[in-house]
Amino acid sequence: GGPNFLPGEHVYAAAREALEKDSGQYGNNRGSDALLDAFLEHIEQIGMTGYGRVNCATGIGAKHVIYNLAEALLDEGDTITFPVPYWTSYLDMAEIVNAKVDLLPCPASQDYKMTPAQLDVALAKKPKVFLFNNPSNPTGMVYTKDEVHALADVLVKYPDTWIITDDIYNRMLFDGLEYTNFVMARAEWRDRGLLIDSLHRPSRRRGGPGGVSARRAGGARAGAASDRL
């Protein structure tokens, strides 16, 4: 997750300017308008249309945003399911909110990728949340467009499960690999799909994290979760 090069000078210049123009006042807890607008511009580039500032919230890194969502969506005893290998903090965050965890083993023999059949079995157990990570940390695996759409098709059958898709590495692809947006794969569950993205990863600012989430407007349950953040 850590590139071996430093941010460009424009990143440092923007940080200096922000410090020099600091008002000393509290800001919007969702993030400044300029920050949210920059994120909205990015998600439009990856195919997410129909979103506005009200659909977004920022945090001190994607970990902070995912934890906020765990607190908002998961009550004690609820189940969250996600593939293995997984990013190191997923399990800890689930344990902090006293959620149950259903792990889906995805060994090297299947390229560390979850299959639609695996997901179908897991969702039949009625988890509250399905957490998806693409491109993957720690494996570096990237699902193809066809693979993303096959998984998205399965989720249509389970309308009571929230989908959190951790896509913070979507602009860090190599070897001709392409990213496919999971939230936009099927309109049927878009209102309960929550995209996690990063503002610091693509600019290599690991010491200055900024995470962002976006959810579609119009879903009553999505609005309820947002209000609890």
Can you describe what each PLM-predicted range is?
Residues G1-G61, N68:
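N-terminal small-domain helix-loop-helix segment of the aminotransferase-like
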Residues G50-C56, E76-T79, K126, R190-G193:
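Short acidic capping loops at alpha-helix termini that bridge into adjacent secondary structure
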Residues P107-L177:
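Active-site phosphate-binding strand-loop segment of PLP-dependent enzymes
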Residues V84, K100-A108:
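Short beta->alpha connector loops at strand-helix junctions that form conserved
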Residues A13, R186-L229:
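Conserved core segment of the aminotransferase class I/II
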Residues D78, A99, L155-W162, R190-D191:
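A short helix->loop->beta-strand "cap" motif at the edges of active sites that frequently abuts
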